[in-house]
Amino acid sequence: MNVYDLAVISHIENITDIEFEYILSSQDDKYLYVDNNILKLHYKDKELFIDFNSSEILNRINPSTKKCSVVQAVEGRSKDKLNILDTTAGLGRDTFTLAARGHRLVSLEKDCYIFVLLADTLNRARQIPNLKDIANQIELINIDANEYINTASISFDCIYIDPMFPQRNKSAKVKQGMQVLHDIAFNDDESNSNLLKNIIISKKTKKAVVKRPINADFLYGKKPTSQLKGKTNRFDVYSL
């Protein structure tokens, strides 16, 4: 397949202003393509695309569904609509879930491949009546989180960090999308600790929330103000 296919170039140019030459790769094991007007990433023997209209996401944002842990951790006792910075957009599930609660999101994704997949699903969501208003709550930016923290002039009610957990195995229980995301966009704990450090120093928020494996060390060695614990992970909440 020619990764410089005009359909791919046209599709990317229609959903984002990023330069397509920066994205398209001549690598045989990693390339973008369009299938039924959906932008997809082929990576080795796997396929990745993002769909905010999936049954999983729709169930997650259903008002009758119990608030998930990320919502509880970010909102706390607040009843207000918040301005939130998601420093690690990834597959966008937490961003979209928080936006569905009426919050405004600036969502950062440094990997250009994942970024355009997110831009594509946001563009599709804006064409769906019941998702349009949610998608319009999200500003997606292709940038490294540390760079954004160091240069942005605005502040937020909450800054959220969801570092990918180290993969212990490649079992079938690990979803294919997470396997691909981990392989191409993983940051180690040192990088994530530096991010939390920069957030604290920047004074751009009074609250930071970090998602961690249940038994993992604290990022930046800093004990949180409070925690919300689940079976396999926890949310460390910092009042700054």
From Swiss-Prot:
Catalytic reaction(s) noted: guanosine(1516) in 16S rRNA + S-adenosyl-L-methionine = N(2)-methylguanosine(1516) in 16S rRNA + S-adenosyl-L-homocysteine + H(+)
Cellular compartment(s): Cytoplasm
Enzyme nomenclature, EC number: 2.1.1.242
Lineage: superkingdom: Bacteria
Chain positions recorded as S-adenosyl-L-methionine binding sites: R93, D94, D162
GO molecular-function term, one example from the UniProt record: rRNA (guanine-N2-)-methyltransferase activity
Annotated Gene Ontology cellular component terms: cytoplasm
Keywords recorded for this protein, A-Z: Cytoplasm, Methyltransferase, rRNA processing, S-adenosyl-L-methionine, Transferase
Predominant cellular place of this UniProt entry's protein: cytoplasm
Protein family per UniProt: Belongs to the methyltransferase superfamily. RsmJ family.
Function: Specifically methylates the guanosine in position 1516 of 16S rRNA.
Protein name as catalogued: Ribosomal RNA small subunit methyltransferase J
Organism: Francisella philomiragia subsp. philomiragia (strain ATCC 25017 / CCUG 19701 / FSC 153 / O#319-036)
